[in-house]
């Protein structure tokens, strides 16, 4: 009866009815998946800023130009690159309280990529950003840069002390609130002695 009492939407009621103490009472017999467009041309960059606030101030530049992905990494996240083979930048040069935006554009036409490789670095530099690698279109180099973001969780997990567990929290905010949120999270982690905490996420989506 809880399924009917606790939920209003028919799909929620159904979902809570099909799995119960007696087992699963329904299953998917057929699934139809739609493919998504995968443009053949991609260019990527990593832009460093002296603070989270500066990085978030530059986010609209990337969003308005149609960036397909924008990831925010705090200083602790950026330093995990030291555990990768041949990191694309020197992780020991990352300053305290700095942050970075890792971003990618996907296009169908060469002239679109050429425009972005000229306009984006210029716009980000005007906002105080530094692109140590410039814009990268080579697939192998892009993969190396993506591996920093994709490898964050396993890297942090592998560094934990014996007998400890990794704690993860997923938070969603308007990206305009992220500077305050990240700074307050850092203070909370420091207050409770989570000194090895890292903060990263999908900046364009505020997650």
Per-segment meaning from a language model:
Residues 1-207:
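Noncatalytic alpha-helical scaffold of FAD-dependent oxidoreductases
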């Amino acid at each position: 009866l809880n399924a009917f009492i606790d939920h209003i939407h028919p799909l929620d009621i159904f979902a809570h009815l099909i799995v119960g103490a007696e087992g699963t009472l329904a299953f998917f017999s057929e699934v139809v998946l739609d493919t998504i467009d995968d443009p053949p041309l991609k260019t990527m960059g990593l832009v460093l800023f002296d603070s989270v606030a500066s990085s978030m101030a530059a986010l609209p530049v990337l969003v308005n130009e149609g960036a397909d992905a924008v990831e925010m990494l705090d200083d602790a996240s950026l330093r995990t690159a030291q555990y990768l083979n041949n990191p694309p930048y020197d992780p020991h040069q990352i300053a305290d309280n700095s942050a970075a935006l890792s971003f990618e554009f996907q296009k169908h036409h060469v002239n679109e990529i050429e425009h972005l490789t000229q306009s984006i670095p210029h716009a980000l530099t005007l906002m105080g950003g530094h692109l140590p690698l410039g814009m990268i279109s080579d697939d192998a180099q892009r993969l190396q840069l993506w591996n920093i973001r994709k490898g964050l969780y396993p890297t942090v997990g592998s560094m934990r002390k014996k007998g400890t567990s990794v704690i993860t929290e997923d938070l969603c905010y308007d990206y305009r609130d992220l500077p305050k949120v990240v700074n307050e999270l850092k203070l909370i982690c420091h207050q409770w002695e989570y000194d090895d905490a890292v903060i990263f996420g999908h900046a364009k989506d505020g997650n």
